A protein has these predicted regions:
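ATP-binding/phosphotransfer module of carbohydrate and carboxylate kinases, centering on a glycine-rich
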Residues: 1-66, 76-79, 97-107, 119-129, ...
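Short hydrophobic alpha-helix segments
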Residues: 30-32, 86, 155
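Short beta-strand segments
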Residues: 9, 67-73, 134-140, 144-146, ...
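Short loop/edge segments at beta-strand edges and connector loops
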Residues: 109-111
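Generic beta-strand structural signal
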Residues: 105, 130-135, 139-143, 147, ...
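Adenylate-forming
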Residues: 117-122, 143-145, 164-165
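Structural signature of FAD isoalloxazine-binding scaffolds in flavoprotein oxidoreductases
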Residues: 158-162
Length: 313
């Protein structure tokens, strides 16, 4: 019986790696820099070297390894083909076949947000559930949809791109994707800050935020907890947009639980309770009791999800 597996989370600045037992026990984690020079051609070389070195260091034979699972910051088709990965400089190629040939081990790949959602379902905030939607509120808004324990990636690997649900009809500013009115423009860490600056410029009511040199999502939520009316308006607006988007998703896939993660989620239940309030207001009545949980694995969700990709469970 194979005893070990590797989980890999490729980010724009670092590649996170984990060696696991097949029961989900994390034995060791580490990271290396993401070398994006020359269209990221060194990335898989570095991953292959790290895996080979770790096997030698731990005296683990390849026959004892179930495989390697990878989260990639871009769409990945069902056969392991990266369709485009701007952050890494990658064009279209099959990452599973390429890395598998380099290390002589089975490889499975998926979009990083989907893979992180799989990790949270397995060992994190979604543990015990089979139908999970994860929303990651960071620099952008990512998402992952898990139904019956399986990632829903869709035809083009774009399933779960929650951040690009349209929530504002007449927005003039453009989202990073090139469209307008996307959830990511308002619910990401950068989006919340941008919205705060807009509100401060048109609403002259007193606010702690006016005294802060560098406004962040954290300072906004801290001010809201302290009773700042303008900050609370920002949190309510954020909660309404997220709640509305999740209500739409619930009509399509009817999850058991929404798992909220990413840096913005550090606001904790203050944020979750506002999202839930607007979710219940907007959701189809049969879906109103969907649970909300905070993510628990933090930056390790990607490596947990990676190894879960290659486990036959």
């Amino acid at each position: 019986m194979r005893k070990y597996g590797f989980g890999i989370d490729i980010g724009g600045t670092t590649i996170k790696m984990g060696l696991f037992k097949v029961d989900g026990t994390l034995l060791e984690k580490w990271e290396v820099d993401t070398r994006k020079e020359e269209n990221g051609k060194s990335i898989l070389d570095d991953i292959a070297k790290e895996i080979k070195d770790k096997l030698e260091e731990k005296d683990i034979h390849k026959n004892d390894v179930v495989g390697v699972g990878i989260g990639v910051p871009g769409p990945v088709s069902g056969d392991g083909t990266v369709l485009k990965c701007v952050n890494l400089g990658w064009g279209v190629f099959n990452v599973e076949e390429t890395l598998s040939e380099m290390i002589d081990l089975p490889v499975k790949a998926g979009n990083d947000a989907n893979v992180a959602a799989l990790g949270e379902m397995w060992q994190g905030g979604g543990k015990g559930y089979k139908n999970v939607v994860m929303v990651t509120l960071g620099t952008g808004v990512g998402g992952g949809i898990i139904i019956d324990g399986n990632i829903i990636s869709g035809t083009n690997g774009a399933g779960g791109e929650i951040g690009h649900i349209k929530v504002i009809k007449n927005e003039t500013e453009t989202c990073g994707c090139g469209k307008t009115g996307c959830l990511e423009q308002y619910a990401s860490a950068t989006g919340v800050v941008k919205e705060s600056k807009k509100l401060l410029s048109i609403d002259d009511s007193p606010s702690i935020l006016r005294e802060i040199n560098v406004i962040t999502a954290k300072t906004i939520f801290d001010a809201a907890k302290d009773g700042d009316k303008l900050a609370n308006k920002l949190v309510e607006d954020l909660g309404e947009k997220l709640g509305s988007a999740l209500a739409t998703i619930s009509c399509i896939c009817d999850p058991e639980v929404f798992v909220i993660g990413g840096g913005v989620s550090k606001a904790g239940m203050v944020l979750v309770n506002v999202i839930r309030k607007y979710y219940i207001e907007k959701a189809f009545h049969a879906c109103e009791e969907t649970k909300f949980e905070l993510a628990k694995l933090g930056n390790d969700a990607g490596i947990y999800g990676g190894v879960r990709l290659v486990l036959n469970i």
